[in-house]
Curated annotation (Swiss-Prot):
Primary role: Catalyzes the formation of phosphatidylethanolamine (PtdEtn) from phosphatidylserine (PtdSer).
Cofactors required: pyruvate
Residues with Pyruvic acid (Ser) modification: S174
Record GO biological process: phosphatidylethanolamine biosynthetic process
UniProt EC number: 4.1.1.65
Signal peptide (residue range): none
Organism: Acidobacterium capsulatum (strain ATCC 51196 / DSM 11244 / BCRC 80197 / JCM 7670 / NBRC 15755 / NCIMB 13165 / 161)
Description of how the protein assembles with itself and partners: Heterodimer of a large membrane-associated beta subunit and a small pyruvoyl-containing alpha subunit.
PANTHER family in the record: ARCHAETIDYLSERINE DECARBOXYLASE PROENZYME-RELATED
Name of the protein this chain belongs to: Phosphatidylserine decarboxylase proenzyme
Residue pairs linked by disulfide bridges in the UniProt entry: none
UniProt key word Membrane: yes
Modifications made to the protein after synthesis: Is synthesized initially as an inactive proenzyme. Formation of the active enzyme involves a self-maturation process in which the active site pyruvoyl group is generated from an internal serine residue via an autocatalytic post-translational modification. Two non-identical subunits are generated from the proenzyme in this reaction, and the pyruvate is formed at the N-terminus of the alpha chain, which is derived from the carboxyl end of the proenzyme.
Cell location: Cell membrane
Length: 228
């Protein structure tokens, strides 16, 4: 379980006990007890089987694939997979590839519904570029939603990460985008459910030249993405 779950859960359990002592019964303590149970469940962090193999990109989050598209950016043409996380999904984020954190760019913004296409540009977000061991770069974005008001990223530039390793959290419903060069074969489709760290999203195609189209300026992606 994520540490936040213990904090919220224990705090509400204390509230429930205080209410019980003040009222002499448990009827008024039911609500904080239910909320405590919800937070303990919401911040769950199940173990995942991380797939092995070369050139694989795994999902950085649990949720539903809402878009698979090609977009134009100042860095060239990229492929984007968007994943919507409802309040019922696990909200732990995981690294899509093994490598080194090349850059982290935080952008203040709005809190539009994560299903709104405009949320990719206007919402609060954190853009992370991971330079894979094979040399290419994969970008993923933690995007806040209508209820998600806090983005957590636990790594720093230069840190080593493994494929499927826990790297952050988005609280209470959100969206995660992953951007990759054209030289990757997409293995998921719109509407498919994915699991963070275990579902394979894409595979690098041999001889596809994935290095040339790798994004290098994550701070500009949010405002300049254009669908093809």
């Amino acid at each position: 379980m994520v540490r936040d779950g213990y904090f919220y859960g224990l705090a509400l359990l204390v509230v429930a006990v205080i209410v019980h002592l003040l009222t002499g019964g448990w009827s008024w303590a039911v609500l904080p007890l239910l909320l405590a149970a919800f937070f303990l469940w919401f911040f769950r962090d199940p173990k995942r089987a991380i797939p092995g193999g070369e050139g694989l990109v795994v999902s950085p989050a649990d949720g539903k694939v809402t878009e698979v598209a090609r977009i134009r950016t100042p860095q060239g043409e990229l492929q984007r997979i968007s994943i919507f996380l409802s309040v019922f999904d696990v909200h732990v984020n995981r690294s899509p590839v093994a490598g080194t954190i090349a850059s982290v760019a935080y952008q203040k913004g709005l809190y539009l519904n994560a299903m709104d296409p405009a949320s990719a540009k206007k919402n609060e977000q954190n853009t992370v570029v991971v330079r894979a061991d094979a040399g290419y770069e994969i970008t993923f974005k933690q995007i806040a939603g209508l209820l998600a008001r806090r983005i957590v990223f636990t790594k720093r530039v230069g840190d080593r990460v493994e494929r499927g390793q826990r790297v952050g959290l988005i609280k209470f419903g959100s969206r995660t985008d992953i951007l990759m060069p054209p030289g990757f074969e997409i293995l998921v489709r719109q509407g498919q459910r994915v699991s963070g760290g275990s579902t394979i999203l894409a595979r690098a195609a041999e001889g596809a030249g994935v290095l040339a189209a790798a994004p290098t300026a994550p701070g500009t992606l949010a405002s300049t993405e254009r669908p093809i």
